[in-house]
Amino acid sequence: MRCVVYSIAKSSPLELVKIYQKQCRQFDCELELVDLFPKNTANAQKISKEFAQKSYSLAFEPYLNPKAKNIALHPKAQRGDSFAFSKMLENHLNINFFIAGAYGFEENFLKGCQAWSLSEMTFSHEVAKIVLCEQIYRALSIIFKHPYHK
């Protein structure tokens, strides 16, 4: 299994994420983080919400894979507990997660993904990545009946 978390962010190594990456390997899952921040994104964010959202879509579109499960994190999307999250991931070998910048996703981009919400609360990219990586590890623990999830 391969899970890739794509985010509109400048690179920021997170020690806790590295721990979850290592733990996911025991379930034969490669957890990878890819930070994208094209030059046009900074300018687009200064112009308008619409320009910013378009720049996020353009950055993410090459990574949308029709053979993978594509999941966009969106505060107004479906949410559930860790068991529901694990069901969503189960039986998929390639899973792509997308975390937009401050202005969120364009509606057109969301149509190509399943949307999921970690919370109604707003998180920094760093916190969202840590929560997501922990939940991926927890989902794998549930799927493989590992005692971590209890």
UniProtKB/Swiss-Prot annotation:
MF terms (GO), sorted A to Z: rRNA (pseudouridine-N3-)-methyltransferase activity
First-level EC class: transferase
CDD domains membership: RlmH-like
EC number(s) per entry: 2.1.1.177
Sorted UniProt keywords: Cytoplasm, Methyltransferase, rRNA processing, S-adenosyl-L-methionine, Transferase
Pfam families in UniProt: SPOUT_MTase
Localization in the cell: Cytoplasm
UniProt main location, coarse: cytoplasm
Described purpose of this protein according to its UniProt entry: Specifically methylates the pseudouridine at position 1915 (m3Psi1915) in 23S rRNA.
Name of the protein this chain belongs to: Ribosomal RNA large subunit methyltransferase H
The species this protein was found in: Helicobacter pylori (strain HPAG1)
